[in-house]
Each structure stands twice: as structure tokens, then as C-alpha cells.
Amino acid sequence: LWNKIKYGAILIIVTNIFAQDFWTQAMNSHYSRRVSHFNNLPVKKGAIIFIGDSITEQCNWSELFDNPDIINRGIGGDVVDGVAKRIEFLKTSEPAALFLMIGINNMNRGDPNDAIFKEYKLLVEKIKAYNPSIKLFLHSILPINENSFIGIPIASNESIEALNQNIQKFSGNMDAVYVNLFSHFLNSERKLDKKYSNDGLHINGEGYLLWKQIIKKYICEI
């Protein structure tokens, strides 16, 4: 009996390792395909760019706002430094505005807030150096809900809020607009409201409609 238990435990561990390896490879392949795709798409003058991770990628922004000038440059799994490596197109294009949300994947892989914010500042400075006239909007990172989270989150809403406060303070130094989404998505327990998410991290259609209501005034002014 003991040998059967040990065999079963080993089988579960090996299966989990292979599953994790599969999803890691799948995410890496998806990432490289998206980067390759974006590198072959011209950014037209006056475009409005949404850039970030899967939360950005999963929205059809141009349809949401009925605006063909909006383009999506989100990639699932991306981190701050990943976005920094993807913005070379700003050197040779003239988009009107850029909406940025990034950082939750850094937090969920265990990066400390100080390190994330240091990379974030370098990213924003790089954006402004490449395109000084661009209208830059810095989204707060959204809250999470640990009760419905897939797996065990490393990030906490307390750490997210602390990073958001740093981003807000920094935005004023960079002539950027800070967009507070965080507080709008909270429930009474100060977690991501379940009506906007089914996994505690990503948002659903209702969530994107709320996001639209918060930023539509900025889109209309561009």
C-alpha cells in the first residue's frame, strides 16, 4: 500500500511538472508570436495605443470605443521590462497617445515593489525620450481577489495599492495622466469585485465596460 501511495504521489508531481513546462512553453511561444506580429504592423500617425499584459490583450479596444485609431499592443504574461523592450516603434512612429498598464505579473513572480517601480520609471522615461510629445496615460494596477484566484497569488492588494501610489506620484513628474482604476473595481472587502472577474485577476466584459466609462473622457479629448 505504501509503495502505491509513493507511486501515486510521484506521478502527480511529474504530471504537474510536465503541465507547468507545457504552459511555460505555450506562453513563451505566444509571446514571441505576438512580438513578431507587432513588429510587422505599422503604427499609423495619430494612433491611440493600449500596451500591457493579458488584461490589455484580452480587450478589443477599437470595438469597445468604436474607434479604428485604437490599437492593441498587449501580450499575456508580459512584465515591465518586457514592455520596455517592445517600444522601439515609438522612435519611428507618431502615435497620439499611449495607455499603459503593467506590473501585476512582476508582483506575482515575487519581484519586490522597489525593483518593479525602478523598472517602471525607466520604462516611462524611455517612452518620453522616444516620443516627447505623446500623451501618456498611466493606469493603476487593478486589484485582485484571492478568494477566486487561480493558484496562490504572491501579490496582495496592499502591495498593489502601494505600487499604485508610487506610480501616481511619479506621473506628475513625467507630464503623464494617472488613471485610477483600482478603487473603481473594489468590493466592500477591498478585493476585486467578482462581478468583474471570474478568476480573481482578469476582467470580464462588465469590467471592460467599467474601464471604458472611466477613460472615455480621455479618449474623446485626444
Walk through the language-model features, giving the residues of each:
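Extracellular/periplasmic catalytic domains that process cell-envelope and extracellular macromolecules
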Residues: 41-44, 64-65, 92, 129, ...
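Acidic/histidine-rich helix-loop elements
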Residues: 22-25, 67-80, 108, 151, ...
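Catalytic His-Asp segment of secreted/periplasmic serine-dependent ester chemistry enzymes
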Residues: 20, 143-222
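N-terminal secretory targeting modules
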Residues: 1-49, 57, 61, 220-222
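Charged helix-capping and loop-helix junction motifs
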Residues: 113-123, 156-163
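Oxyanion-hole/transition-state-stabilizing segment in secreted/luminal serine hydrolases
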Residues: 50-51, 56-69, 80-118, 126, ...
